[in-house]
Every structure is written in C-alpha cells, then in structure tokens.
C-alpha cells in the first residue's frame, strides 16, 4: 500500500553528492571539506552531501572517529554554511569484539540463528553481527545513536546494506522480514537513502537505481 510520502524535497530539488568515489574508506574531515569546496569551485550548486563508510571507528559505534574528524561539529557547521545538507552512511552491522557487540549480545538484540546463537554475516566488508531491527528495543538503541548525530547537526542518513542475503537462512525470522524492518526504520527519517529494500514499494523512501 502507498504510504504517506514525507521525503525531504531537498533530495529532488538539488544534486545529491556522495564522498565514496572520492575518498572510499579514507573519509576524513579535510577530505570531506575539500570535496565540498571543489564542487562549488567547479560551478556546481550545493545540494545533499552524503559522507560514506569510513567516518566511524567501527560498525555499530556511530560516533565520528576523532582521528579522522577532529571537529565534526565544526565541519557540519561549515558544510551547512556552504549550503550543503549532510547525510551519513550507516548499516545494520555490528563489528564483533566491540563494546557495542557485547552490550547488544547480552541484551538479546542481535540477529540469531535457529539455535539462538548470534549470527555472524559475511558481507562485502567482512564479517559482522547484525542488529535485529524486528525488535523495538533494537530500533530504540539505534535511534539513540542517530539522535546524538542529529543533535550535532547531521540532517539524515544513507541506510546501506540490509539485503535479505546478509541474514541467516536458518533463522526463525526470514531475511526478507529483516530487510523490510531495516527499511521501515529508515522511513521515519525524511532524509533517507537506500541501495536496496524488500517489499517496500510505495513507501516514503529514496532508493537509487544504480551507482554512477
């Protein structure tokens, strides 16, 4: 069914830029600002700027890496001054052997296999646990992380991964259900972007057709 479309008009009124091709995993404060200024210096208008994977120290620890971003608040303020709307890349994965992983495993908020063991998914960036977005408590946990980022000045989020194939085939809950739950969480943000969704036609989501 068609959902109430609440997408931010800025996703369509101006270009959407992404730092991935320029910086890949080497996202830094200097690199992001240099990229944004180069956009303007080359006669292009400001628009939505997505800071891609590599801005945090690990997956699930959704805080700016202080080694790469020594003053994230100042960077966000400068990007806004230049006319950009800023989105951050996130994913449902949790890096194993981190404080976040141990906390989420102890509280039962990670995806498990049929035997009840925390599932470790093999995805394009290696091996990670997966946040169980079918649980309201897991959604609340992630929302708190994103609330903190928005309080700093982040405007929205690029919700990557969430593909059905990255969830266990022997889980009680199907991969399609998990993928749809990831999309449902992201839909609450008017500034969202997805690479892939499942069963979310007519939802208030921006999904790209392909990488360019």
Give the label of every model feature segment.
Residues 1-212:
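Catalytic-domain carbohydrate-binding cleft regions of carbohydrate-active enzymes
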């Amino acid at each position: 069914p068609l959902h109430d479309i609440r997408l931010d008009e800025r996703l369509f009124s101006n270009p959407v830029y992404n730092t991935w091709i320029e910086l890949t995993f080497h996202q830094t404060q200097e690199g992001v600002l240099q990229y944004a200024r180069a956009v303007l210096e080359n006669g292009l208008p400001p628009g939505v700027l997505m800071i891609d994977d590599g801005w945090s120290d690990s997956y699930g620890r959704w805080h700016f890496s202080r080694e790469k971003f020594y003053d994230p608040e100042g960077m966000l303020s400068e990007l806004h001054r230049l006319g950009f709307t800023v989105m951050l890349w996130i994913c449902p994965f949790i890096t194993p052997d981190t404080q976040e992983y141990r906390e989420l495993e102890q509280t039962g908020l990670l995806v498990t296999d049929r035997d009840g063991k925390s599932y470790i998914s093999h995805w394009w960036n290696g091996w990670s646990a997966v946040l169980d977005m079918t649980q309201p408590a897991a959604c609340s946990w992630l929302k708190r992380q994103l609330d903190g980022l928005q309080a700093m000045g982040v405007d929205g989020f690029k919700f990557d991964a969430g593909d059905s194939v990255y969830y266990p085939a022997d889980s009680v809950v199907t991969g399609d259900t998990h993928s749809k739950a990831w999309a449902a969480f992201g839909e609450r943000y008017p500034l969202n972007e997805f690479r892939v969704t499942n069963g979310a036609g007519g939802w208030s989501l921006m999904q790209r057709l392909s990488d360019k």
